[in-house]
Amino acid sequence: MVEWTDDERAIINGIFSNLDYEEIGRKSLCRCLIVYPWTQRYFGGFGNLYNAETILCNPLIAAHGTKILHGLDRALKNMDDIKNTYAELSLLHSDKLHVDPDNFRLLADCLTVVIAAKMGAAFTVDTQVAWQKFLAVVVSALGRQYH
C-alpha cells in the first residue's frame, strides 16, 4: 500500500480542482496519439486518425480523453486503494482490449506535459513529485493484471 503525506494529498487534490477535464483530457490523449503513433492501433473504431489535424479534431478522441480524466478522478477519490479501484479496468485493458501496459505510462507522461504547460510556474518540483507518484500508482494498478 502506498503512503500519502498530507502535502501530497493536498497537491494532487489541488491539481484536480483546477482541471478542465474536457480540455486536458483531449489534449493529453491527442498528444499521446500524435507523439506515439503506434498507440493509435487501439482506437481503430474512432474514425480517421490519419494525421495530427484529424486526431486533434476527432470528437471521439476528445470524448475518450474526458473519460480517461474522469477515470483518474476515481483514483483521486480512492487514493488509499487505487489498486482495487482499478482492478476491473485492468482486466478490461489486458484481457479484452489487449492494450500494451507501457502505453499507460506514455499517456501519463503526456498528461504530465499538458498539466505542466497549463499550470506554468505553479507546477513546481514538489508538485511534480506528488503528481508523478500519483500517476505511477495509477499506471501500476492499470498494469496489475499483466503481472
Curated annotation (Swiss-Prot):
Molecular-function annotations in GO: haptoglobin binding; heme binding; metal ion binding; organic acid binding; oxygen binding; oxygen carrier activity; peroxidase activity
Keywords associated with the record: Heme, Iron, Metal-binding, Oxygen transport, Transport
PROSITE patterns noted in UniProt: GLOBIN
Superkingdom to which the source organism belongs: Eukaryota
Family matches, as InterPro entries: Globin, Globin-like_sf, Globin/Proto, Hemoglobin_b, Hemoglobin_oxygen_transport
Positions with a binding annotation for heme b: 64, 93
Residue span, Globin domain: 3-147
Pfam families named among the record's database cross-references: Globin
GO biological processes: hydrogen peroxide catabolic process
Reported tissue expression: Red blood cells.
GO CC, one annotated term: hemoglobin complex
Subunit-level organization: Heterotetramer of two alpha chains and two beta chains.
Protein purpose: Involved in oxygen transport from gills to the various peripheral tissues.
Family: Belongs to the globin family.
Listed PANTHER family: HEMOGLOBIN FAMILY MEMBER, HEMOGLOBIN SUBUNIT EPSILON
Name of this chain's protein: Hemoglobin subunit beta
Organism this protein belongs to: Melanogrammus aeglefinus (Haddock)
Gene name linked to the record: hbb
